[in-house]
Amino acid sequence: MNNINDNAAAAGSRPARRLNLVPLDERYGIGGKVIGVANAGPQVHVGISLADCRYHIHCLGPTGTGKTTLLARMILDDVEAGRGVAAFDPAKGDLIRDLLARLPKECGDRLVLIDPDEQQAPPAINLLDPAVHGGTAHDVAANLTAVMAKVWHRWWGHRTADICYHGLLTLAHLPGATLAQLPRLLSDGKWRAGRVNAVTSSLNAWEGNTLGEFWEGLNDLPAAQRSGLVAPLLSRLRLVLAHPMASSLFGVPATTFSFADILDGGVLLCRLPKGVIGEDGTRLVGSLLLAGLWQATTARARIAEDDRPDASIVLDECHNFLHLPIGIDDALAEARGLHTNFVLAHQYLGQLSGDMAEAIDANARNKVYFALAPRDAIDQSRHLRPYLDDGDLIRLGGYEVVLRPVAGGRIVPPVTADTEPPPPAEPGRATALRRAAREHTGLPLAERRRLLGETATGVGADDEALSGDELTQPPIEPPIEPHNFQPKGVDPERSPVTPQVTSHEAPREARRGDEHAGEHAPLHTTYAHVNDDEEDWWTGTD
């Protein structure tokens, strides 16, 4: 078998590239988000300033009232101004299609397109690479487990969390391992034994023993009982990863874009239609990508506030994706100071869980309402009194909104406005932008086959056991950069293709002085649990 170090080096033979971000001093535009034109009094544009957008925007309105049109205008304004924006579309995908036909052609070299229709050279990101998140293998396992716990909370419990966390932790210690290999790790005993042996023998004694004891305990269970314990996680994970879009995105030991680059001026368009990739696929893929953006947001704390460029994360049907490792209330509160604003759009309040609804109600202080159903109008009219009541919200016309904004950090009286239509579609623009995204942040199929074939831990690799020596690497410190901006006209290879990090994580944990690093417990993360009455661990029901 080839040495894993050689394989990792082969995967990293391509030079690192960056998205071609617009420098801060060259960014222009309205400096905020235009909502529409006032239809009472002087016909002037009304909107939210850039600083006040950091208080986040809650956009509520049933289907057919004009939400998608407004979201498209917001995103186009951000892109044209050179700001970073990530947009998630879980419905029919019309929002992303409309944007591709209208975005400026100059944004092609900072565009990342995640779309099931892209099959020639879709992007890739290895979520198990600690360098992608800027943390350790423990952080990777804890964050991904927390996301899955919230996405699948109805079928989740302590043992599922235990199995998921230790499986992800094992793979995160393996150079070239990917999320797509978690089902094989849990179901293929021979393949698992080689990988577990390699990882435990390469770690510090206390850490390797703790991880080894977990797998020994699982292996000692009767086969039927072991299968029952892993079945809930396996059945749902396989269902998602079986789709070509999910496997092409998360199943290759390479990364072609950076979440930090997106926030610093890139454009991430995620078209995740439920009718194509399934409801579980939409929720898990979108939530994992959002969690990556959240980790990049928290990393901005290392940058001086004046150097943090404003970025927007636009979530259509937001309830599908708000499964962050921390609470939504905490995330919205922290994101404001880190200059990342959320635009949270959905159709009616019943789509939100109780905690989610309270967090959005309190922390997304800019309110945009389209014509609402009576129940929602009664509830939300408390934000508008004494100026407007629930009847005013019910009687709004098509593409008409009530904006209750924040100005200078203070809530101001609401205004009514008519939203503006997006600019006309440009013939051939979508095709040109798809081609540009493919060239700058896509990974061709031939390259994917090479990476999977040359990486010792790749799917399809032989089952020969790995030795610990093959995993031991000199530690690599990820650089701490103040920002990701480059002047225009730099090297044309602009987007990152980062291979799986080959550094051993234990030395870095020792330097951090984390006394709990060897305990394999989630770091600063609480799992979502169900109670004992809601889960049958021993029959494997899911």
Regions found by a protein language model. Name each.
Residues D115, K367-R375:
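Conserved AAA+ ATPase "SRH/arginine-finger" region at the nucleotide-binding site
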Residues E80-R83, P386, T498, H524:
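N-terminal helicase ATP-binding lobe
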Residues M356-Y369:
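A short helix-turn-beta junction within AAA+ P-loop NTPase domains corresponding to the substrate/partner-engaging
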Residues G29-Q43, L50-D52, L60-T65, L70-T340, ...:
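P-loop NTPase motor domains
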Residues L95, Q351-A359:
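Short, glycine/polar-rich helix-capping loops at beta-to-alpha or helix-loop-helix junctions
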Residues D376-H383:
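Conserved AAA+ ATPase core "coupling" helix
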Residues A345-Q351:
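Conserved H-loop
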Residues M1-G36, W191-A198, G228-P232, V267, ...:
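Conserved P-loop NTPase motor module
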